[in-house]
Design a protein with these regions (language model features):
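N-terminal export/membrane-targeting signals
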Residues: 1-21
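OB-fold and OB-like single-stranded nucleic-acid-recognition modules
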Residues: 19-136
Length: 136
C-alpha cells in the first residue's frame, strides 16, 4: 500500500510539473496539441512497479480493473512509453489490459486529456463512455 501511495504521489508531482511547464511555455495554445495514441490500457501502479500490462496479474483476477476503480491513474502503453490519462480512471476500468485508441489534448511529453476513446478488438472499435465521471 505504501508503494502505491508513493507512486501516486510521484505521478501527481509529474502531472503538476508538466502542467506548470506548459503554462510557462511561450506557446499561446494553452490546451496543448491534439494527438491520437493506440496501445494497451494499463493501471500505472502495477505497470510502473512490476511491468504488468494485463488485467489479471500476480495471481489476482481483475487487478487492473480494481486499481483503476480505486483511483490509480490509467495509462496507455505505446511501445515503451506510457501516456498518462488526465481523466477519472474509473472510465477505463472495464478495458484494463485491452487495446485502446485515445484522442485528446496532449500536455508535456506524456499526458493526455482524452476527448474520445475507443476499445479495439477483433470486431473493430467500440466507444468508451467518457461522460458522467466527476473529477475529484
Amino acid at each position: 500500500m505504501k508503494k502505491i501511495l508513493m507512486i501516486l504521489a510521484l505521478l501527481a508531482l509529474a502531472v503538476g510539473q508538466s502542467l506548470a511547464d506548459d503554462a510557462s511555455a511561450k506557446d499561446s495554445d494553452s490546451k496543448g496539441k491534439t494527438i491520437t495514441v493506440q496501445g494497451i490500457l494499463v493501471d500505472t501502479s502495477c505497470y510502473f512497479e512490476e511491468g504488468q500490462k494485463g488485467d489479471d496479474h500476480d495471481g489476482m483476477k481483475a487487478c487492473g480493473k480494481d486499481c483503476l476503480n480505486s483511483g490509480v491513474p490509467a495509462g496507455v502503453l505505446v511501445d515503451d512509453k506510457v501516456y498518462i490519462l488526465i481523466f477519472p480512471a474509473k472510465a477505463f476500468a472495464d478495458v484494463a489490459g485491452q487495446t485502446v485508441e485515445i484522442k485528446g489534448d496532449a500536455y508535456g511529453d506524456n499526458l493526455i486529456n482524452p476527448k474520445k476513446a475507443f476499445v479495439i478488438d477483433k470486431n473493430g472499435k467500440k466507444p468508451i463512455k467518457l461522460t458522467g465521471f466527476e473529477m475529484m
